[in-house]
Amino acid sequence: MWRLPAFAVGCSQVVLPGEQPALVRNYDYDQALFEAVIASTDYSGRRRVLGTSDMLWGLLDGMNEDGLAVSLTFGGRPDVGEGFGIPIVLRYVLETCATVEQAVSALRRIPVSQSYNVALVDSAGHHATVFVAPGQPAEVSELHATTNHRLDQVEHPTHAARFNSVGRLSRLDELRTGDPSGRQLVAAMLAPPVRNDQFEVGFGTLYTAEYQPAAGVATWHWLETSWTRGFDDPDDIREVRLA
């Protein structure tokens, strides 16, 4: 996964730190390019990982049994450079890191091929959002919510406007000021303007993932159903309607 072809669209993510930390994210993409696999793995034999698979062994989001959760959103820049594809970077972080501090250190040193906002939270309630881009140092922030521009800075207004990046972020920031519960946040993520239904142009919300690293469980939400998984759950299948 080195210097992958450019791919982008949407996604929204929010970190809830504190005593019961959570990471909630919407994945907005082309349904035809989605693997629709939730992978529970123990590749190293030392650290189990649970997350949404991409490119067979990469991850779009996930959590490990140490209590570290991670997800991504496209960072708004169209350029591609020398570096690893972000799915394998997220896999590496969850395979090798136990805390937000360790994950930030890893993201500082790993070159990436495109720009992304990477949200992190651990079971101790520590959090960070890291903007990574090809050819530049990682930018570390304490932002709780990000959509599809560089942290809270719009660099490419046309793309941001096309996918309502600012509008979605404004809604997430508004929610954050009300100190929402995880349930309230999930409900908002499943409703406009955060949820998207432009499936015909590859901009539909394929799932809302809710990671609870202290509890060791993750739940994938859709309009009509939810599916909670833990590290010890057996293989299973769910069929869902996206719209």
What do the PLM-derived regions correspond to, one by one?
Residues 1-17:
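Long amphipathic N-terminal alpha/beta scaffold segment
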